[in-house]
Structure formats: C-alpha cells, structure tokens
Amino acid sequence: MPRSQINGNFIDKTFSIVANILLRIIPTTSGEREAFTYYRDGMSAQSEGNYAEALQNYYEAMRLEIDPYDRSYILYNIGLIHTSNGEHTKALEYYFRALERNPFLPQAFNNMAVICHYRGEQAIRQGDSEIAEAWFDQAAEYWKQAISLTPGNYIEAHNWLKITGRFG
C-alpha cells in the first residue's frame, strides 16, 4: 500500500487527494503515475524525518521518471536529505544534478551557497583564511544566482553580500 494511503497527516492526505485527481485528469502514462507515487511517498517520509525510506522512494522515482523537470525536483529533495544528514559533498552533487535539468531552482542555489558559507566558516575556525575566502566567494556566486531568479527573496543573503562587498 502506498505510504500516502496510510499517512495520517491532513496536509499529506489533502495533497494526495488533489494529486490523484490531477493524475486522472492529465494524460499520463502508468510509468509517470508510478514515478509520482514514489515521489509523493518520498516527500511524505522526508517530512516525517524517515530519510532512509524517503531516499528509497526517490531513487525508485528517479528510475521511472523521464521528464528532466520532474527529475530535477527529485534530485533536489535527495540533496535536501544529504544536507540534513551533514553529507554536504553528496548534497552539492545532487543540487548540481538538479540544476543541470532545471536551472531555475533558486532554492538549490541557496542551499549550495549555505553549504559553501558553512565550509568557509569551518575554514576560519581551522585558521585557513585563504580557503575560507574561496568558499565565501563561491557562496556569493550561488546566492547571486538565487537572488537573480527570485528578486526580493533571500534578504539575509542579500545583506551578507552587501556587507562583505560581494554584491556587484
């Protein structure tokens, strides 16, 4: 039984009902429907902190999904899980892969910037200011891309760019 049919969360149930209606209305193949079911179940597991289950569902959705745009969101969510688990190198890889398929994911650019900024702070704590500056410069580039896609969002990043002289 798909996870979405047993989940007690009101929002998840509502999303599942709406998604099922849309899947009936919009012409889709059985493979696309199955991929979406795995994706939806992955999101449900992820929202509950069941990352291993979420990853299994996302990997299965990736196996079935052929649309690059839809795959970008699956890859992005896999990146989120790796970020949550502190696996920043893996997370960056999945965010890059998501952006290869959909370059209009400001949240992926933002998350990549956050990881780079974090690594810059780690380098400072280790006494390596040169490496820190390189990480901060990379964070700035990613934040600029996120901001250019969604002006008015990422206010803290925008302020950091101004304060550090990296906006421009």
From Swiss-Prot:
GO cellular component: a single term: chloroplast thylakoid membrane
Renumbered ranges of TPR repeats: 35-68, 72-105, 120-153
Membrane topology reported for the UniProt record: Peripheral membrane protein
Subcellular location: Plastid, Chloroplast thylakoid membrane
UniProt-listed PANTHER family: CELLULOSE SYNTHASE OPERON PROTEIN C, TPR REPEAT-CONTAINING PROTEIN MJ0263
Pfam families associated with the record: TPR_1
Gene symbol of the encoding locus: ycf3
Annotated keywords: Chloroplast, Membrane, Photosynthesis, Plastid, Repeat, Thylakoid, TPR repeat
Similarity section: Belongs to the Ycf3 family.
Biological process according to GO: photosynthesis
Primary localization class, coarse: plastid
Function: Essential for the assembly of the photosystem I (PSI) complex. May act as a chaperone-like factor to guide the assembly of the PSI subunits.
Keyword Zinc-finger among UniProt keywords: no
SS bond partners: none
Record's protein name: Photosystem I assembly protein Ycf3
Domain of life: Eukaryota
